Amino acid sequence: MRLHLLLLLALCGAGTTAAELSYSLRGNWSICNGNGSLELPGAVPGCVHSALFQQGLIQDSYYRFNDLNYRWVSLDNWTYSKEFKIPFEISKWQKVNLILEGVDTVSKILFNEVTIGETDNMFNRYSFDITNVVRDVNSIELRFQSAVLYAAQQSKAHTRYQVPPDCPPLVQKGECHVNFVRKEQCSFSWDWGPSFPTQGIWKDVRIEAYNICHLNYFTFSPIYDKSAQEWNLEIESTFDVVSSKPVGGQVIVAIPKLQTQQTYSIELQPGKRIVELFVNISKNITVETWWPHGHGNQTGYNMTVLFELDGGLNIEKSAKVYFRTVELIEEPIKGSPGLSFYFKINGFPIFLKGSNWIPADSFQDRVTSELLRLLLQSVVDANMNTLRVWGGGIYEQDEFYELCDELGIMVWQDFMFACALYPTDQGFLDSVTAEVAYQIKRLKSHPSIIIWSGNNENEEALMMNWYHISFTDRPIYIKDYVTLYVKNIRELVLAGDKSRPFITSSPTNGAETVAEAWVSQNPNSNYFGDVHFYDYISDCWNWKVFPKARFASEYGYQSWPSFSTLEKVSSTEDWSFNSKFSLHRQHHEGGNKQMLYQAGLHFKLPQSTDPLRTFKDTIYLTQVMQAQCVKTETEFYRRSRSEIVDQQGHTMGALYWQLNDIWQAPSWASLEYGGKWKMLHYFAQNFFAPLLPVGFENENTFYIYGVSDLHSDYSMTLSVRVHTWSSLEPVCSRVTERFVMKGGEAVCLYEEPVSELLRRCGNCTRESCVVSFYLSADHELLSPTNYHFLSSPKEAVGLCKAQITAIISQQGDIFVFDLETSAVAPFVWLDVGSIPGRFSDNGFLMTEKTRTILFYPWEPTSKNELEQSFHVTSLTDIY
């Protein structure tokens, strides 16, 4: 067991002083292509694709087949340039730097026609000394090289041996050799996304001028004294001292609400200097801890750090201080070989519930603050507490992590390496070293981040031999793997952040991987670490096909996004499941067939003679299939948290693949591009509920487990009802004796042979009846109402076509949908087209004549607009 104790401080800002000035170069720049035939203005931060679109030179890059039509943009070499006048007297400053927070990706930088440096890493922050070349009036140029061409050159130059994979599968329509360039890996395509290898200045760029000294980095390391039961804090400040003499002064650290104020004397010698301060927080002060969503508050404390230095130089930093501990528990389990794999936050075992995050857009300048908040609010609204930031995308922007801190979303943070082997030549390692060191400094202050992971699936790719490497050559690649992730990235993490755990890969066997010299024979073992699991052939309603693993960090099924989302980027001839557009948009080999196959196991496929109706019905059915499959699998993981069966179990995490979409296409996402909730996301709101009854069958016996994520025990009852498909009145019901549901456990609450249940309920057969159940106390509902199908819906007897009507009214900012049905209706789907917002529930089984559902609009709308856009579908409508 490894103990990681954490006190975190999120930087909020800094005061400017008389001894330093900053001048932003954000805004309008000039852009031209390689041969100078195309010149246009472009915004910074931004990229070439966005600039071309904003000038009307290209359409929306996501429209129809434009990912192929605009491939030329990524293959050209573009130049960004700007002329500007600095609004202060430059000669008064001892040091002037050009700061680039993010350059995408390969460029040569000229300042006043002097080459000052190069960039080759999208994830690094670059600082160039321009003291000797800067003037009052200046010019700057970034001459980009196509990342696609650069990657090909780097691969060609690596002559000693191949570093696979060379190219993505043809179905992805992507570019090759992405593993040779430190750029967003999915920008060369993925099985859910397009190929748009962008070029541009994608983050802030500015001039910094200073005298005496400058504070470059300001980071924090926590120390918790268990014996004294008190918090301490190490503050690490990195200075660039340009004074020729030592700089003395004092530092005042203040956290008012913790009644903490301490003063330190410091002296800085010329050059790059690090100051470490040790702050003690009295154990007599009650410190409120930061908790994940659903487990407590996200309490933070304001802190100021004031440096009062010689020469009248004052530098002030403000920060938000969060207190929490994180432990990754890997220890023996009675009755099972291997080790546990779960997290304790503030000493309490937490079941991680959530999903995997991918970039929200191929063009990061389109990812607004509003979109980030919308997507992350949807995470907690669905009762999730965790996101895994997947290693094939980007280290997200600061605001993403700030929102996760605020909302209580734990972050599993991958380093940006995915589904590939990587070179380990010195130039590549040097670039990675700078990247990782910078990202650790930037992100370590966030309480939301609970673990670093070295890569996505690269250990599995190597050991399961995805790339058909010969047995004799394998040691070369194992050596490279250990060099990159263990000897470099791991060492950087251990040196830069001792406050949270690190694992080399996902999936991995954790401590067992370490014992096996960093590469396990089976990284997907059910007895160690985490697993990734995908199976599109086995029946997803059969829980026995799922791994009873310690932690499921990836699993899922595809579906199509709603018609209103696809309509924006398609034309009328595209609106069929077998159209050229539908095949083009599917980047997962065989994906469309897999969806229909899985749906056909339990549902009748759409039978309309109208092609457009069939397309819409098929979209609906893929979302039903996806939601039901992921529900079955997630509920299996949740009910496995407290038990060992056949030596397997104690599952303590379920992160389905994937949360969000990068464009409008079929994928594993539960949120469509732009944020609209698929049926799966509504299901997640229920299957991730803090209290949940889970029903399943084993050997013709029906079981209901109670699952609790709560910290306390609660007294309650379980109600079980059986309906026939042909009646809105239950044919029988049963309420258990009152029992105590223990916090943080999953236990069996109900057990009955299916034959006995059917006999007890009169005329029921498997095909004619359905079971629903819920937890309550004193007539108060404590859980969602869950259900269990006794047979496939395609075999249902008595299921009638339901006539469902809705009366819409408004209450403040919320709209009320009063529904009425003529018959039992499975998978009732309420849709208001492109009107942004979400319902309180959706995709539900309607077994009562009336039901009230709320609609929460994300933008102003009206009752009339909703009535015009509203459409309701249930399962029998597609037959």
From Swiss-Prot:
Subcellular location(s) of the protein: Lysosome
UniProt keyword list: Disulfide bond, Glycoprotein, Glycosidase, Hydrolase, Lysosome, Signal
Cysteine disulfide partners in this protein: C167-C176, C540-C629, C732-C761, C764-C769
Effect listed in the UniProt record for changing L749H: No effect on enzyme activity (in vitro). No effect on protein stability
Effect of V253I: Decreased enzyme activity
Record-given protein name: Beta-mannosidase
Enzyme Commission number, as recorded: 3.2.1.25
GO biological process assignments: glycoprotein catabolic process; oligosaccharide catabolic process; protein modification process
Pathway: Glycan metabolism; N-glycan degradation
SUPFAM superfamilies with a match to the protein in the record: (Trans)glycosidases, beta-Galactosidase/glucuronidase domain, Galactose-binding domain-like
Residues of the active site: E457 (proton donor), E554 (nucleophile)
Pfam families xrefs: Glyco_hydro_2_C, Glyco_hydro_2_N2, Ig_mannosidase, Mannosidase_ig
UniProt note: pH dependence: Optimum pH is 4.5-5.
Summary of subunit composition and partner proteins: Monomer.
GO molecular function, one term: beta-mannosidase activity
